[in-house]
Amino acid sequence: MADGKIVQCIGAVVDVEFPRNAMPKIYDALKMAGSELTLEVQQQLGDGIVRTIALGTSDGLRRGMIIQNTGNPITVPVGKATLGRIMDVLGNPIDECGPVSHERTASIHRKAPAYDELSPSQDLLETGIKVIDLVCPFAKGGKVGLFGGAGVGKTVNMMELINNIAKAHSGLSVFAGVGERTREGNDFYHEMADAKVVDLENPENSKVAMVYGQMNEPPGNRLRVALTGLTMAEAFRDEGKDVLFFVDNIYRFTLAGTEVSALLGRMPSAVGYQPTLAEEMGRLQERITSTKTGSITSIQAVYVPADDLTDPSPATTFAHLDSTVVLSRDIASLGIYPAVDPLDSTSRQLDPLVVGQDHYDTARAVQGTLQRYKELRDIIAILGMDELAPEDKLLVARARKMQRFLSQPFHVAEVFTGAPGKYVSLKDTINGFKMIASGELDHLPEQAFYMVGTIEEAIEKAKKLN
């Protein structure tokens, strides 16, 4: 392949000149002679010049430096060799456990599966978290988004889902850390090792592969690391496995695109995002899907800037998801964790034909009661509880019990709360809320329902309070 030379370097964007008859293709990987740095071609400007994004720091680059065209897109190791390992965007190991075997590699850019290869799923994925299982159940092979502003518990919820699903899950998991804190990546690795999901002695017996492009990395790495993780998940799916794919945080993927978009010469669109936002998001999300061979169940954390769900980035993500779990600052401020908003959160699975009539009726009864309580709160704030009709007073009492019963101690938060984590089966969840809605537990104080697992625990707690 022909060599080129750097003609311009602005931050993470580098222009390279090649002979006119040997211009690299879009998405080709370029290597710098005598260095680990990889560049990815984004645009062909004409006259032999291509505009690239550096997947690494561009410090020390200068005009005239020699760049080699590999002739291929970025490829990363896939298959069993990736299990138990921590890799970067290029598939290089960053866990100090030696090189990753390159028996099989795959390009991080590929087309989404054809329509006739797709396999829709109706099976439910039980999470053990009451509020999620009740009002926004997950589908096996579906896509789930955890939406929330800063500090309302996206990562803690994600870790609890990993704890409840990945540890009990017989298949494999891939975790992509996109632009998040390095500390969280480190904690996750050690937690997985303690739970034997990562086998430190025989990594190939592990059940999880980890790919990190943390917030201290250049934008090129953060832009591509989700694709690297997805490529590894697709390889397992194509072998006939059921894969869990966790992404924390999909917003940073968008943000990395925004950072380089202006440098690539594109006009910004709404709120300064890249004009190609919907296309980039679609290209990633359309690949996260289940085929007749195997399934990918994806759980993605989505940061919501300034708690504004109408911001273009979360709004674009909404369109691709089967279930949306919305975390609310108002609920967190009441001390109710997980701070999931049962009125804002939705799921395509919450349909009597999928979950069954009993589950559906219970979920709608809970949502109806909480919605009515929300409407009455203004009256209570102005006139007080005494001005309410007797039936409304009863409804408010039940709604407050439901609200508290939606809280639950988490396994991953045991060290902070001192309370042992609880996993609640779907059957127990439905039974508990049915009893509250029917009025069977009207005689119990509302404190008894706070931070417990099953309804039996709430009844026991009420006895102690008395």
Curated annotation (Swiss-Prot):
One of its GO terms (molecular function) is proton-transporting ATP synthase activity, rotational mechanism. Keywords: ATP synthesis, ATP-binding, Cell inner membrane, Cell membrane, CF(1), Hydrogen ion transport, Ion transport, Membrane, Nucleotide-binding, Translocase, Transport. Its EC number is 7.1.2.2. InterPro entries: AAA+_ATPase, ATP-synt_VA_C, ATP_synth_F1_bsu, ATPase_a/bsu_AS, ATPase_alpha/beta_chains, ATPase_F1/V1/A1_a/bsu_N, ATPase_F1/V1/A1_a/bsu_N_sf, ATPase_F1/V1/A1_a/bsu_nucl-bd. It is found in: Cell inner membrane. ATP binds at G148, G149, A150, G151, V152, G153, K154, T155. It holds the Pfam family ATP-synt_ab_N. Transmembrane segments: none annotated. SUPFAM superfamilies: C-terminal domain of alpha and beta subunits of F1 ATP synthase, N-terminal domain of alpha and beta subunits of F1 ATP synthase, P-loop containing nucleoside triphosphate hydrolases. One of its GO terms (cellular component) is plasma membrane. It is an enzyme of class 7 (translocase). It is a peripheral membrane protein. It catalyses: ATP + H2O + 4 H(+)(in) = ADP + phosphate + 5 H(+)(out). HAMAP family: ATP_synth_beta_bact (MF_01347). Belongs to the ATPase alpha/beta chains family. F-type ATPases have 2 components, CF(1) - the catalytic core - and CF(0) - the membrane proton channel. CF(1) has five subunits: alpha(3), beta(3), gamma(1), delta(1), epsilon(1). CF(0) has three main subunits: a(1), b(2) and c(9-12). The alpha and beta chains form an alternating ring which encloses part of the gamma chain. CF(1) is attached to CF(0) by a central stalk formed by the gamma and epsilon chains, while a peripheral stalk is formed by the delta and b chains. Produces ATP from ADP in the presence of a proton gradient across the membrane. The catalytic sites are hosted primarily by the beta subunits. This is ATP synthase subunit beta. The lineage of its organism: Bacteria, Pseudomonadati, Pseudomonadota, Betaproteobacteria, Burkholderiales. The gene is atpD.
